[in-house]
Amino acid sequence: FVMSLVDLHKETGVSALDLAKGMLDYGLHPPTMYFPLIVHEALMVEPCETESKETMDEVCDIYCKLFELAHSDPEALHTAPHDTPVRRLDEVGAARNTILRYTFA
């Protein structure tokens, strides 16, 4: 399913990218962002058919926590992730200056 975070963005300034980065702090792989292009502030969530109800409930609980955090402390999501080895990457720079091969030293 696809969800639009336009209202959340208007209310709190938290974007789909911010929410996706916040998911990393909870150990979740973020969904596809900003696709389809006709949906503004889109997150496309595609759970596997084999996921248990318990896992889906846990993911829903994390989404609720993130939405609460967006309203109570939006800056925490603007600066997320906090608990990963690498913080926010320069995604524009990475897209424009791609490294397709890496040589280990």
Task: Cite the ranges covered by each PLM segment.
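Non-catalytic terminal extensions of PLP-dependent enzymes
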Residues: 2-105
